[in-house]
From Swiss-Prot:
GO molecular function: 16S rRNA (adenine(1518)-N(6)/adenine(1519)-N(6))-dimethyltransferase activity; RNA binding
Gene from which this protein is expressed: rsmA
SMART domains xrefs: rADc
Purpose: Specifically dimethylates two adjacent adenosines (A1518 and A1519) in the loop of a conserved hairpin near the 3'-end of 16S rRNA in the 30S particle. May play a critical role in biogenesis of 30S subunits.
Entry protein name: Ribosomal RNA small subunit methyltransferase A
UniProt key word Transferase: yes
Pfam families: RrnaAD
EC number per UniProt: 2.1.1.182
Similarity remark: Belongs to the class I-like SAM-binding methyltransferase superfamily. rRNA adenine N(6)-methyltransferase family. RsmA subfamily.
Catalytic activity: adenosine(1518)/adenosine(1519) in 16S rRNA + 4 S-adenosyl-L-methionine = N(6)-dimethyladenosine(1518)/N(6)-dimethyladenosine(1519) in 16S rRNA + 4 S-adenosyl-L-homocysteine + 4 H(+)
PROSITE patterns documented for this protein: RRNA_A_DIMETH (PS01131), SAM_RNA_A_N6_MT (PS51689)
SUPFAM superfamilies linked to this entry: S-adenosyl-L-methionine-dependent methyltransferases
Organism: Lachnoclostridium phytofermentans (strain ATCC 700394 / DSM 18823 / ISDg)
Residues annotated to bind S-adenosyl-L-methionine: 28, 30, 55, 76, 102, 126
A Gene Ontology term for the protein's cellular component: cytosol
Length: 290
């Protein structure tokens, strides 16, 4: 079995299997042991944990996970990586299940039920940057029982997840993530920690899921419609953003009245509102729609 974690071993494995990186899968393998160890520490993995790894690649981080967790479920979309994982890099571990599937099509709740009795799991991943948001939001919206999600993402995306009102990075993603979890940037990771090197900076972010939502809202679906509409046309006022949104078909007068009841100026932009204010606005509009 090849023990991974530095460029030399990674290259040996790739050459042995004549592996070719596929751009469509956003493959950038981690080759820095310090970063790998930091991810494991940040996720606070113990021998009691079931860990879901998304996109194990050649199994570099999976090896660390197998040595620290009770059980690992690794979901890999690229069929060309499965022989490497099963026959080589993970062959000596008996606590890992490899699933060759698109993570967006996997019933993770069923896995949690079968393998962890429905108790919260931990999610660890070096995520493909082109589908970071769909993966994370998919986990949230499916209400998968999760303790924390510790993932490598594009630096710009990590900044957006952690940003607050009024900052240039604050947006719909910030609010959505913060509704479900408490984000914390663990480390910034330069391109030379990957093979091949990405063209952007990266960051490890830990999302610790809230046991209870930080705000109470009667209509969660409406809340997220309002948030998306407010940032679709970022430079417009909140009122114009909501009035122009195809998702929200409400009379202009109703929107104006709701903003007035919220107690903010009529010219305010969505980027100035907190999560609490969006929740209050959703409740006001929900009441008016009845």
């Amino acid at each position: 079995m090849a023990y991974l974690g530095d460029p030399k071993q990674t290259i040996e494995v790739l050459n042995r299997y004549r592996f070719i990186f596929q751009k469509k899968f956003g493959q950038n393998f981690l080759i820095d042991t310090h970063v790998l160890e930091k991810i494991i520490r940040s996720a606070e993995i113990t021998k009691d944990d079931l860990v879901l790894e998304i996109g194990p690649g050649i199994g570099t981080m999976t090896q660390y996970l197998c040595e620290n967790a009770r059980e690992v479920v690794a979901v890999e979309i690229d069929k060309n990586l499965i022989p490497i994982l099963e026959q080589d890099t993970l062959s000596s571990y008996d606590n890992v299940t490899i699933i060759n599937e698109d993570i967006l099509k996997v019933d993770i709740n069923q896995i949690v039920k079968e393998k962890n009795g429905g108790k919260p799991i931990k999610v660890v991943a070096n995520l493909p940057y082109y589908i970071t948001t769909p993966i994370i939001m998919g986990l949230f919206e499916a209400h998968v029982p999760i303790d924390n999600i510790t993932v490598m993402v594009q630096k710009e995306v990590a900044d957006r997840m952690q940003s607050g009102p009024g900052s240039k990075d604050y947006g719909a993603l910030s609010l959505a993530v913060q509704y479900y979890a408490d984000p914390y940037i663990v480390a910034n990771v330069p391109p030379n920690c990957f093979m091949p090197r990405p063209n952007v900076g990266s960051a490890v972010i830990r999302l610790t899921l809230h046991q209870d939502a930080p705000v109470k809202v009667k209509n969660e679906n409406l809340l997220f419609k309002l948030i998306r509409a407010s940032f679709n046309q970022r430079r417009k006022t909140l009122a114009n953003g909501l009035n122009n949104s195809p998702e929200i078909s409400l009379p202009k007068e109703m929107i104006s009245e709701a903003i007035e009841e919220l107690g903010v100026v009529a010219t305010i932009r969505g980027e100035a509102l907190t999560l609490e204010q969006f929740a209050k606005l959703a409740d006001i509009i929900d009441e008016k729609m009845k």
